[in-house]
Curated annotation (Swiss-Prot):
Biased segments, Acidic residues type: 470-494, 502-521
Physiological role: Component of the FACT complex, a general chromatin factor that acts to reorganize nucleosomes. The FACT complex is involved in multiple processes that require DNA as a template such as mRNA elongation, DNA replication and DNA repair. During transcription elongation the FACT complex acts as a histone chaperone that both destabilizes and restores nucleosomal structure.
Chain residue ranges for the region called Disordered: 467-538
Name of the protein in its database record: FACT complex subunit POB3
Major localisation: nucleus
Organism: Candida albicans (strain SC5314 / ATCC MYA-2876) (Yeast)
UniProt miscellaneous comment: In contrast to the orthologous protein in animals and plants, this protein does not contain a HMG box DNA-binding domain. This function may instead be provided by the HMG box of the associated NHP6 protein in the FACT complex of fungi.
Subunit architecture: Forms a stable heterodimer with SPT16. The SPT16-POB3 dimer weakly associates with multiple molecules of NHP6 to form the FACT complex.
Length: 538
């Protein structure tokens, strides 16, 4: 048995090149060791191969293989000289002919679509301009009367930039069905044919959903929920849960979400004591045009009950789901939904922690800019719902600042919580929080090791310090002014009574003047003829 190898071949637009091998048993591909890729080897049995085509590709020439059950396989990077050898090997091993296909290079953006077995082909002048494998399409939506939008899967293993959305303008109408209507006139029955027309865009959308397997997933749904209210994105959707993904079917939009896209599941009682919220954090997010939805917010009435049984056989349940799900449920709808999501996604269900508000609730009402919602201080993060939904882990918070802004009565009743995030200059500000919740939130943040700055307490402390300093300054001034009186009352340590050095009249008002003093006074009268000085007026 002779094998034929081709080097530097890229499988389905992969980042890394590899080796392609053709053998009698089938076709295989393996990433080269030098690329450092962790991709698993790809094997395609010969019985899966239907037809093959040869055309220009992005890295040279491309081999496209149509299969029975594995979609279309793209192998890019061949040289022009490889065509002859490749054709011989495919004929010898698989008994298929290698068709040479030329692409249209006119550059027109109008043409005809061909919904083939494994891919959508856009033809211009009867030549393919491009092909879109159905496996690359994640969602399709009728965004207007004549417009259909396609959303594509994001694959981190592909090289370079990726297209994420494409829209087709499909004008016109199509006669769909003819209905016979019977009318009675004067006792006679008259049959009239009524032609039902639908838009061409609607027809294209329905056909694409069937071909691309968007509207339904292969196999039966394990569990289904109908008419579930979504706050984000707004609307009501039917939810079908399958082994590896779930479907959201609404009036306008349909979505397919892989369980691996779901990163976190929150189950939170709404502080209004009437509703319960389930929040799904997904990556990559859902898209509606240019709008991205990284969080899905579901709302349930607390008293609503659901009774259901899983749509799986007893054997499959015992083998696959026994440790994750229950066979039957009879409980509030939000509890059933949470348990099913946790079991199928194998993600932890995040519920309220130790925080309780003044009214013994898990969250507090507040506002983000002009949007009202609820802030939930959970064990590891702040979560604000509903719009915009904000997820802030405590590990990413540098500090929180509590402050009151504005004036008047309202300022004394509410406060603002400013959350500063590490590496960001734009804080998250939650305003209009009830003033009575400040103590509860502050103590909870300190328990979680979050640095808290209370501007009101800081201002009061500064004011008290300033008043204390001012009082100390006043005491010092009073002490300086009272020092003279203290000196009069203190005993003079230099004074010695009975000492000869002390003159009696200096200390005794009754002492007689000495003779020396009399002589000095007489001399001064004789020598000083100047007029006496005037006394200063007080």
């Amino acid at each position: 048995m002779v094998n034929t190898d081709f080097e530097k071949i890229y499988l389905n637009q992969s980042r890394a090149g590899g080796r392609m091998r053709i053998a009698e048993s089938g076709l295989g591909w393996k990433a080269s060791a030098s690329s450092g890729s962790t991709s698993q080897p790809f094997l395609l049995p010969r019985e899966e191969i239907l037809i093959a085509s040869w055309s220009r590709g992005s890295k040279g020439y491309e081999l496209r293989v149509q299969t029975k059950n594995k979609g279309v396989v793209s192998l890019d990077g061949f040289d022009h000289d490889d065509f002859t050898q490749l054709k011989q090997e495919l004929t010898r091993n698989f008994h298929i002919n290698l068709e040479h296909r030329e692409h249209s290079l006119r550059g027109w953006n109008w043409g005809k679509t061909d919904l083939a077995r494994n891919e959508l082909i856009f033809n211009v002048n009867n030549k393919p301009a491009f092909e879109i494998p159905y496996s690359d399409i994640s969602n399709s939506n009728l965004t207007g009367k004549n417009e259909v939008a396609l959303e594509f899967n994001l694959d981190n293993n592909k090289n370079g930039d990726e297209i994420v959305e494409m829209r087709f303008y499909v004008p016109g109408t199509i006669e769909n069905e003819t209905t016979i209507v019977k009318n009675e006139t004067n006792g006679d029955v008259i049959e009239e044919a009524v032609v039902n027309e639908t838009s061409a865009a609607q027809q294209f959308y329905e056909q694409l959903k069937d071909k691309a397997d968007i509207g339904q997933v292969a196999g039966e749904a394990i569990v289904s929920f109908s008419d579930v209210l979504f706050l984000t994105p707004r609307g009501r959707y039917d939810i079908d849960m399958y082994p590896s993904s779930l479907r959201l079917r609404g009036k306008t939009y349909d979505y397919k979400i892989q369980y691996e896209q779901i990163e976190r599941i929150f189950s939170l009682p709404k502080p209004d004591e009437t509703h319960h919220l389930i929040v799904l954090q997904i990556d990559p997010p859902l898209r509606q045009g240019q709008t991205r939805y990284p969080f899905l917010v579901l709302q349930f009435v607390k008293d609503e009950e659901t009774e259901l049984e899983l749509n799986v056989s007893d054997e499959d349940f015992e083998k696959k789901y026994k440790d994750r799900l229950k066979k039957t449920y009879d409980a509030p709808t939000n509890v059933v939904m949470s348990h099913c999501l946790r079991g199928l996604t194998e993600r932890k269900l995040i519920t309220p922690g130790a925080f309780q508000s003044r009214y013994l609730q898990a969250g507090v009402p507040c506002s983000v800019k002009a949007s009202e919602g609820y802030l939930f201080p959970l064990d590891r993060c702040f979560l604000f719902v509903t719009k915009p939904t904000l997820y802030i882990p405590y590990s990413e918070i540098s500090s929180v600042v509590m402050s009151r802004t504005g004036g008047g009565v309202s300022a004394s009743r509410t406060f603002d919580l400013e959350v500063n995030v590490i590496g960001s200059n734009q804080p998250h500000v939650f305003s209009n929080i009830d003033r009575e919740e400040q103590e509860f939130i502050e103590s909870f943040c300190k328990e979680k090791g979050v640095k808290v700055k209370n501007e009101e307490k800081i201002a009061k402390a500064r004011l008290a310090k300033a008043l204390e300093q001012e009082a100390n300054d006043d005491d010092d001034e009073d002490a300086d002014m009272g020092s003279a009186g203290d000196e009069d009352e203190d005993e003079d340590v230099d004074f010695q009574s009975g000492s000869d050095s002390d003159v009696a009249e200096e200390f005794d008002s009754d002492a007689a003047p000495s003779s020396d003093d009399d002589e000095e006074m007489a001399d001064s009268k004789e020598t000083d003829d100047r007029p006496p000085k005037k006394k200063a007026k007080n």
